[in-house]
Curated annotation (Swiss-Prot):
Gene3D superfamilies: 1.20.5.170, 1.20.5.340
Coiled-coil residue windows: 1-284
Protein name as it appears in the record: Tropomyosin
Keyword entries, A-Z: Coiled coil, Repeat
InterPro entries reported for this sequence: Tropomyosin
Lineage: Eukaryota, Metazoa, Ecdysozoa, Arthropoda, Chelicerata
Chain's role: Tropomyosin, in association with the troponin complex, plays a central role in the calcium dependent regulation of muscle contraction.
Signal sequence interval, chain numbering: none
UniProt similarity note: Belongs to the tropomyosin family.
UniProt free text on domains: The molecule is in a coiled coil structure that is formed by 2 polypeptide chains. The sequence exhibits a prominent seven-residues periodicity.
Region (Disordered): 1-38
């Protein structure tokens, strides 16, 4: 009987120890479950951050693509402006060459006019000299009359030549007026072209400034992309670490649950043994 009591006390003590171990295992299991939930929550938070970073990265890449498109458009506009400037330069060169030819024709016409005027003055001088000379000798008179006729003929020829020269001079003056009008038109066009060149130059400067800003923005975007990539890599590393931690905690939870099941089985076995012992004692 004393042995049975000792055995019952030992079994009760073992039962109490098993209950304590079971409670401890349950507490550890709950704590492990809380740690696992916390780790899972951190993983979800990291996944959200990763998704947010990926969205920001997509936005930055889209902005970079738009900036590159705008930069290409500005390059095309710059090339078109340069082509327009080259066309204006060619037009100015043609106008300058036309003006030089007109000035050369005017110079030649002026020289011819001076030569014709000198010839007409010389003929008129000879005619007046022959008309006013007093000659008493008949032969000399006849000779002089012949010379006079010849001089008149020469004068008439000179008049005809003068008329021809005058007609040509009028044509030259008309050509000169047209050349001057063309020169004035050319000067006006040159002024307009210079103004256009100034506007184009300002546009080129603006494009250069815009290009510099675009390059600066591109560098900023690239730096942001590098930063986002680093942040994404760090977040992925943290996520991998958190996943490994969750796996470890899950293994710990599984182990504690297995121990809990074992302790419950031991507790059940002890309870069954106690019940059997009580039944035996009662029957005894």
């Amino acid at each position: 009987m004393e042995a049975i009591k000792k055995k019952m006390q030992a079994m009760k003590l073992e039962k109490d120890n098993a209950v304590d171990r079971a409670e401890t295992a349950e507490q550890q299991s709950r704590e492990a479950a809380l740690r696992a939930e916390k780790a899972e929550e951190e993983v979800r938070s990291l996944q959200k951050k990763i998704q947010q970073i990926e969205n920001e990265l997509d936005q930055v890449q889209e902005q970079l693509s738009q900036a590159n498109s705008k930069l290409e458009e500005k390059d095309k506009a710059l090339q078109a402006a340069e082509a327009e400037v080259a066309a204006h330069n060619r037009r100015i060169q043609l106008l300058e060459e036309d003006l030089e030819r007109s000035e050369e024709r005017l110079k030649i016409a002026t020289q011819k006019l001076e030569e014709a005027s000198q010839a007409a003055d010389e003929s008129e001088r000879m005619r007046k000299m022959l008309e006013h000379r007093s000659i008493t000798d008949e032969e000399r008179m006849d000779g002089l009359e012949g010379q006079l006729k010849e001089a008149r003929t020469m004068a008439e020829d000179a008049d005809r030549k003068y008329d021809e020269v005058a007609r040509k001079l009028a044509m030259v003056e008309a050509d000169l007026e047209r050349a001057e009008e063309r020169a004035e038109t050319g000067e006006t066009k040159i002024v307009e072209l210079e103004e256009e060149l100034r506007v184009v130059g300002n546009n080129l400067k603006s494009l250069e400034v815009s290009e510099e800003k675009a390059l600066q923005k591109e560098e900023t975007y690239e730096m942001q992309i590098r930063q986002m990539t680093n942040r994404l890599q760090e977040a992925e590393a943290r996520a991998e670490f958190a996943e490994r931690s969750v796996q470890k905690l899950q293994k710990e939870v599984d182990r504690l649950e297995d121990e809990l099941v074992q302790e419950k089985e031991k507790y059940k076995a002890i309870s069954d043994e106690l019940d059997q012992t009580f039944s035996e004692l009662t029957g005894y």
